[in-house]
């Protein structure tokens, strides 16, 4: 009896569910071109981020976003309706992204007159690759030593301040900008989509990437950690000119389709609008904890708004003195240097980009590398520079002379011996080497001033003692005709008119 009562109830539930499903399946018919057919939440629910729930709350779908980012290149015409746009890029080519302020009057007043920070990333679109992102990027680093995945084209950019590129995060760049001013950043993507395909037999499809922008405002402590807005877009990167060919091929294919088939596809838009997304989950860690070698000092490179050229010369970056806490800076790499000291030496000698490649290398390991080894690891330019630095090679000066300062006491001793008829060849002279590159009187004056610990302005003239004791004024041409490793005794003579001195080379 119990079974007889439950069966009709179950049938009614199943039948009711089928009716609801059928009604839901018909609800979209005739609305394909309507406003309700395209749901932003559907796009944001794509498996494009590492977090499972990446779609935004439904109540925020219709709000006006504070910022908008526009990638100034056309979208692909071969994308179906309700699918996310896809944009093709050429490897290494500079593409403009416009940073637009969409705030209403009175909205976010705390940003007025303030800067915000934006962090750009190129990440994987496919979830399968997201799970192995670290291994994928490490493999790319080994195959392309010294290269970056993402770069800023600073000369072409406008309005960006303090651009930075962390040498340990090849796919990330960041900068500050003023929302009230025109801001455009030109980015370059150096990896291509086919570099991350599983099977490489030729003709395979490349994996899609995402370019994501996260923007933050300053908190009470002056750190840019308060999230304001995030947006991203799907891209594919081809070898140079490959994106143009792919765009042309897609356009020709669409032209061959019937009008009914074309209605199923989106038109190609002249620009790509980045759509809102969830912030990158590790952004606060990256922002607050730069890795060794990431220059966290505020050496800004403001970009002018007119022609994109810097409005003043940037200050030279401060030398890195303490890379590893508790270590004293070392000048030369020794065979006994520990891996930590080797890392410090790499940073001090401007090889921070390769520090991760040589993480476990001791001083002996680095010094054993051949010229071919370092060129293969670091590329020709940086490889030769690293090899010369490891071997301690110093550029040979164009001219070397040896000088000795003749003291008053030594002069009196020589004069006394001469008056008494004693031989004067027992004097002991200590010489100093002077290395000249430009071989000019100005350079010689500066080097002699350093030797005497005086200002170059205190040296009036430099003479060379000639035949019969005459004083010949030193000129650039005379210095250029000095014999290499010539020896001179320096004598000083007070100038007649001021507190300066004449130097005589004997």
Curated annotation (Swiss-Prot):
The keyword Repressor does not apply. Residues 61-300 form the Grh/CP2 DB domain. Residues 241-265 have a biased composition (Basic and acidic residues). Residues 238-268, 291-316 are annotated as: Disordered. Its main location: nucleus. One of its GO terms (biological process) is positive regulation of transcription by RNA polymerase II. One of its GO terms (molecular function) is RNA polymerase II cis-regulatory region sequence-specific DNA binding. It holds the Pfam family GRHL1_C. Residues 291-300 have a biased composition (Polar residues). It is found in: Nucleus. Keywords: DNA-binding, Nucleus, Transcription, Transcription regulation. The keyword ATP-binding does not apply. Residues 133-395 are annotated as: DNA-binding. One of its GO terms (cellular component) is nucleus. It comes from the Eukaryota. InterPro entries: CP2, SAM/pointed_sf, SAM_3, TF_CP2-like, TFCP2_SAM. Belongs to the grh/CP2 family. CP2 subfamily. Component of the SSP (stage selector protein) complex, which appears to be a heteromer of TFCP2 and 2 copies of NFE4. May function as a transcription factor. This is Transcription factor CP2. It comes from Xenopus laevis (African clawed frog). The gene is tfcp2.
């Amino acid at each position: 009896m119990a079974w007889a009562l439950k069966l009709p109830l179950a049938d009614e539930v199943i039948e009711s569910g089928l009716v609801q499903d059928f009604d839901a399946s018909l609800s979209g018919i005739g609305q394909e071109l309507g406003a309700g057919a395209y749901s932003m939440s559907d796009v944001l629910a794509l498996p494009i981020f590492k977090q499972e729930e990446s779609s935004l709350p439904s109540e925020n779908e219709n709000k006006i976003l504070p910022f908008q980012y526009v990638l100034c290149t056309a979208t692909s015409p071969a994308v179906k309706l309700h699918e996310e746009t896809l944009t093709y890029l050429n490897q290494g080519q500079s593409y403009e992204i416009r940073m637009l302020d969409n705030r209403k009057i009175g909205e976010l007043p705390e940003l007025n007159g303030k800067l915000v920070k934006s962090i750009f990333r190129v990440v994987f679109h496919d979830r399968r690759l997201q799970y192995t992102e670290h291994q994928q990027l490490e493999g790319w680093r080994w195959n392309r030593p010294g290269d970056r995945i993402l770069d800023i084209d600073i000369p072409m950019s406008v309005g960006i301040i303090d651009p930075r590129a962390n040498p340990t995060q090849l796919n990330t760049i960041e900068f500050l900008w003023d929302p009230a001013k025109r801001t455009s950043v030109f980015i370059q993507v150096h990896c291509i989509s086919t570099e991350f395909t599983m099977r490489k037999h030729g003709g395979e499809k490349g994996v899609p990437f995402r370019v994501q922008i996260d923007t933050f405002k300053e908190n009470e402590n002056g750190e840019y950690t308060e999230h304001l807005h995030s947006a991203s877009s799907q891209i594919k990167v081809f070898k140079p000119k490959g994106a143009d060919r792919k765009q042309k091929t897609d356009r020709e294919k669409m032209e061959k389709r019937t009008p009914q088939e074309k209605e199923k596809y989106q038109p190609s838009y002249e620009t790509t609008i980045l759509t809102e997304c969830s912030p990158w989950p590790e952004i606060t860690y990256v922002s607050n904890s730069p890795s060794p070698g990431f220059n966290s000092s505020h050496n800004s490179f403001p970009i002018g708004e007119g022609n994109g050229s810097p409005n003043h010369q940037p200050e030279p970056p401060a030398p890195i003195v303490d890379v590893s806490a508790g270590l004293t800076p070392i000048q030369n790499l020794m065979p006994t240097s520990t891996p930590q000291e080797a890392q410090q030496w790499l940073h001090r000698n401007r090889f921070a980009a390769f520090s991760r490649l040589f993480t476990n290398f001791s001083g002996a390991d680095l010094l054993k590398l051949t010229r071919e080894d370092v060129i293969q690891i670091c590329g020709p330019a940086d490889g030769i520079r690293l090899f010369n630095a490891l071997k301690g090679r110093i550029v040979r000066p164009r001219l070397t002379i040896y000088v000795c300062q003749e003291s008053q006491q030594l002069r009196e001793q020589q004069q006394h011996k001469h008056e008494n008829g004693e031989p004067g060849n027992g004097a002991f002279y200590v010489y100093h080497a002077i290395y000249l590159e430009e071989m000019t009187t100005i350079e010689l004056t500066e080097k002699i001033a350093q030797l005497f610990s005086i200002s170059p302005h205190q040296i009036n003239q430099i003479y060379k003692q000639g035949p019969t004791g005459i004083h010949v004024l030193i000129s650039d041409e005379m210095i250029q005709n000095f014999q290499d490793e010539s020896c001179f005794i320096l004598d000083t003579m007070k100038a007649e008119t001021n507190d300066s001195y004449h130097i005589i080379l004997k």
